[in-house]
Amino acid sequence: MTSEAATKFVYTTYISTTPEKIWQAITRPEIARQYWVHQNVSDWKVGSKWEHVRGDDGSVMLAGKVIESVSPRKLVITWGEAADYPNEAKHTRVTLELEPIGEMVRLTVTHDDLKAGSDMASSIANGWPRVLSSLKSLLETGKPLDTWAQPKGRINQ
């Protein structure tokens, strides 16, 4: 990220599951596809490339590098448009932290190095809550949410 004004997005949720199940849901493409529609593909080793692959046509939407991988507690990756993969200055950073608390897990996602006011920052603020709500539903009920559905008509009062 360049020296332009930066911002970050932080989202915390509590999921009635284990850190291992959340880790698998994030890192195994066949599970990620269920709640994210797309899949995350990598060997998840430090220094490896990861790709966010569309479930419908297999095209790579996003790509980055694995910075830190401590299964099942912490994953840090860079994040950028697939075309920008070679240019690390255009990458943002995502940190996923999993902390067991009794019979649940506190999952905190911090997406930083975002350019303040950018389309990416806006997209992130809209996207992460949808993805993580669907992940929570899948792990707690066995069914993901269709968080990308359009709202039904509202009644004007």
Please identify what each model-predicted range represents.
Residues M1-V41:
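Hydrophobic ligand-binding cavity/cleft-lining segments
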Residues T13, A63-E68, T92-E99:
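Hydrophobic/aromatic beta-strand elements that line small-molecule binding cavities or substrate pockets
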Residues P19-E20, I67-K74, E97-R106:
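A short, structured loop/turn motif at beta-sheet edges
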Residues Y85-P129:
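Beta-strand/loop substructures that line and gate deep hydrophobic ligand-binding cavities in soluble
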